[in-house]
Amino acid sequence: MPIDCRGRILSDDYYDAITDFPVELLEDYTDEQCYADVDGLYNVIYFGREELRNPQAYFISYRSVPKLYGLMQEGGGTGGFDPNSLIASGITQVQREPLALTGRGVIICIVDTGIDYTDPVFRNEDGTSRILAIWDQTVQTGTPPAGFQYGTEFTREDINRALQSEDPYSVVPSRDEIGHGSALASVAAGSRLNGGYTFQGAAPGADIVVVKLKECKPYLRSFYLVPQGVPAYQENDIMLGVQYADGFAEPFRRPVVICLGMGTNYGDHTGNSPLGRYLSAVAVKRSRAVVVAGGNEGNAAHHFQGQLNNQGGTGANSRAVEVRVEQGVEGFVMELWGSLPDIFTIAVRTPGGETIPPVRLGIRGQITYSFIYEKSRVTVTGNLVEPVSGEELVVMRVQDPTPGIWTFQIEAVGEIHNGEFNMWLPVSQFLSAPVYFLESSPYITLTEPSMASSVIGVSTYDAANNSFYINSGRGFSRCGAIRPDFAAPGVDVPTVNGKGSDSSLAAAITAGAVAQFMQWAVVEQNNSVVESREIKNYFIRGASRSFDVTYPNREWGYGRLNMVGTFDALIGV
């Protein structure tokens, strides 16, 4: 019996692919088609493994294989509510008269792990829900949203019926088992409880829409060597979640702020991934804004920046890159991006002294190496011209790595014109034990897609003492674009689950601030056609800056989020 489209989307027997070409061209690759359109920009294709005529071509096609994104969290905390982060951002001040900006009339959408819809922090004073809808991609017992083929959509009416029931989850069986999505939603839009003394979010008057993402398919977890039990989400599911959020408000002509607290180290670190490009396309729409966390990779030693030249000595036409692999690492995927117009080769030396000669795969190719005395396997995939960036990309997939120092010898072919190359290891949570560069760079460590051109990408600081958060990602982008845009509080931030410290909370605070601005601009018709790029630049003009720091810089971007400063800048103060 043929499996339906929903079955293909959910089954590990079917591969997912992200394409930007007409679906008719897929006849060259597979006989049957099941696909989802992403706003006319991309198609997500689902096809059986046995239907694929050339399986290796699928995995070599870098952009077609969905990347995996992890939660930008670093563990929960304890402690009650305090408004320090909101005050430092000027958010509490503009909640008060005369501006009275609470996000009223604005929709904040959290694309994440779901939400605890029963918590009072997501209810109105009369006990009804402030959540307009939940698209739970993991629940298949109900009806999907219009235009989508999997999951179940729960409306505000459904949620209110559940809240009146003795067993709410028998009516709306959507839970946030991890708590990350609930934390973000509470920081961005949590209700004012007990007059704001017990809890309040940045935009307590905003409505909420939630997308609960399904976890990645096992074949992708295996391909990227992500440990079992670690939350990991597919790029295409996130894209469809963003599309749902964008489209939900269209019938109501409501402004929307989309908050993404996830990230990855896969990609060219210029915002050119399919997700990054799609987020930028949404962000330039009127009455839309997209806020993305900058990640927690700044202190992880997961980035190496190298420079080759023709002069000999340090930085000559060859460079040894050493990677320390601790005991217990199941595997890792590492990427090298080589700058135009140079061509690079890679040789490998294991901790046991076995070697792989310099690898050069031509236009596109893949080769796997095994060793005599070590059980490790190394698969090298090369793209001489990565289609969007135009630069050389080499992906190294290392399975069962021997603990110790791995040496990757990077060499340029022929005369060197630029000589720069960058390498990234996976985000920390995608490693079963530490793996890191012995000579790392803390810069260009913002996670994708925070470097997408039109989104608001933020780094993280501690509002208690105005210090930069040591784990926060740092800019700029690989091509030198100014990222982050600014920093927002993300240390000891009160959430519905206790205090937390990570970049996703900085993004949530910023999303709430954006909702405040959209209330003033769109709902109150002071600038009804504003979009993400304009809001970003208003916020940049109002950001707090220290007199002894040069801006923009790699840590702070243009300064610290300051809503009072933003409105002062509007009136010329």
Q: Where do the protein language model's features map onto the residues?
A:
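Extracellular S/T/G-rich loop segment that most often corresponds to the catalytic His/Ser-adjacent loop
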Residues: 135-137, 148-158, 300-392, 410-411, ...
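Subtilisin-like serine protease catalytic core
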Residues: 95-234, 329-330, 341-342, 451-454, ...
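Autoinhibitory propeptides
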Residues: 1-107, 113-130, 404, 444-448
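Edge beta-strands of jelly-roll/beta-sandwich modules across compartments, strongly enriched
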Residues: 415-428
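Noncatalytic modules at the cell exterior or secretory-pathway interfaces
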Residues: 329-332, 397-415
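Catalytic cores of secreted or luminal carbohydrate-active enzymes
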Residues: 257-258, 275-312, 559, 563-568
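Short acidic, glycine-rich surface-loop motifs adjacent to enzyme active sites
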Residues: 66-68, 240-270, 293-294, 411-413
